[in-house]
Amino acid sequence: MGAGTVVRQLQTLFPFVQITAVEIDPVHIELAELHFGVDTSRAKIFQESAEEFIARYRGPKFDLIIDDLFSGAAGIPHRAVKCSGPWLLRLEQCLIPEGLLAINFADFAELKESAVFKRLWNGGRFKSGFELRSPTTENVIAILMPGSMHSVDLRRHLSETPVLSKALEKGQLRYQARRLRV
């Protein structure tokens, strides 16, 4: 969860959705509540590591899982949990059949080193994927989905989402979306 900026954005976009968030650092949880406006009545926050949470979770499956697991030393971010085949499989098992998996990587090299490409094209649940990038950062977000989708479908969905369509019209959504390819 970090300081809760993604949780807050999701709460704005989807006001009637209950969000489950995991954060190991109690200071980040406090920041999310006090300074970033996370509505805790609509977000159930678990203070533990993502690995512990996923290993013990037996509740309802999720529509979307966002893996944004970073740590950093000397200002250099790196994944706190390796994006390996077993880790991706554990995340997949927590998704509903049509669920999406979004994974944040520090850069494209880190995405290439992960198990995402192998998992995407091994004939498993995910049939398509995208890499999302902003021109202002090196981060790459991989989106894995069970159905076949093209970038035109993604853009159409954005234009049909009221809050996002206004930002899209004003040129405020500066990003690139490309299909993940082997």
What is the predicted function of each stretch?
Residues 1-94, 110-111:
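The AdoMet/dcAdoMet-binding core of the Class I SAM-like
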Residues 16-18, 40-42, 98, 126, ...:
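A generic structural signal for alpha->beta connector loops
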Residues 17-19, 39-42, 86, 121-122, ...:
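Short, low-complexity, polar/charged sequence segments that are solvent-exposed and flexible
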Residues 45, 60, 96, 116, ...:
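Surface-exposed beta-strand edges and their flanking turn/coil or helix-capping segments
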Residues 49-57, 75-81, 119-126, 151-168:
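A short, terminal or domain-edge coil/loop segment
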Residues 55-60, 82, 98-106, 137-141, ...:
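Low-complexity, flexible helical/coil segments
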Residues 75-79, 85-151:
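C-terminal substrate-binding/active-site "lid" region of AdoMet-derived donor-dependent transferases
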Residues 132-182:
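SAM/dcSAM-binding transferase cores
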